[in-house]
Each structure stands twice: as C-alpha cells, then as structure tokens.
C-alpha cells in the first residue's frame, strides 16, 4: 500500500509517537480507555519511532522482542519526500527536534491523530495536526 492511500481511506488513522508506544508496552494505559475502536482504526507509527525504540542502550532481548512484536501489529510508515518536506518545514518553524518533526509530519500527511503524552507535541499548533493525550 502506498503512503498516500492511507490518508484517504475510510476509518481513523492513529500515529503512535515513541512515548505512547513505551507507555503502552509498560501497560500504563490501553487504547480502549481512550475510547479508540481498534477495529475501525489503522494503527501507524513512523520509522523514526521504530529506530528510537530499537536503538535504546542496554535493551534486553526480551524488551527488543516485545517492541518488535508490538511494531509488527502497526503499519510502520517510511520516510518519503512529502513527509520529509513537511518535517523540514516544521523543524524550521518550531523548537521541535528533527525526530519529533518527522513524527508530526507523518501524522499530518496521513491525516492521522497523533497519540502522545509529550507536551511539546500536544501543545503544538500546526495546520492539520490532530493530537490526543494518552492520559
């Protein structure tokens, strides 16, 4: 499936940021408590989130296996030119670091709700950005 097709399909696109994945794996929240119907949603994350999670120093084999198992249930969105250009625009205009700019751009391009508990992302006002606090 092409990335652009995800933005026009029926249903809700949900993009997990790194904190949202970590806290979900730590069982600090569950999707049903957010009122999210998984059956009617596409669960997505950026390739940057995958890289951040799996490049953690001193990651144990069990942690790595849990992360990979969770990510196997998501659509991991690669970096394409449209996301790249939007991330550059966001990075130039905000105090966000590049990884967060890429995650936000992914969410915007896919017309998705960004799941996070990062106040930098939740308080960001940007055209097309939709966020939901996981707590």
Q: For each predicted feature, which ranges?
A:
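Acidic, PIN/NYN-like endoribonuclease modules and their adjacent C-terminal/linker elements
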Residues: 1-13, 73, 108-135
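Short, well-structured N-terminal submotif of metal-dependent ribonuclease cores
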Residues: 1-45, 55-68
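Short beta-strand scaffold positions
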Residues: 16, 45, 78, 98, ...
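Active-site phosphate/pyrophosphate-handling residues
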Residues: 19, 82, 101-102
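A generic structural signal for short hydrophobic patches within well-formed alpha-helices
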Residues: 21-22, 50-53, 84, 121-122
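Acidic, metal-associated active-site segment
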Residues: 53, 98-113
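Acidic catalytic patch
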Residues: 73-93
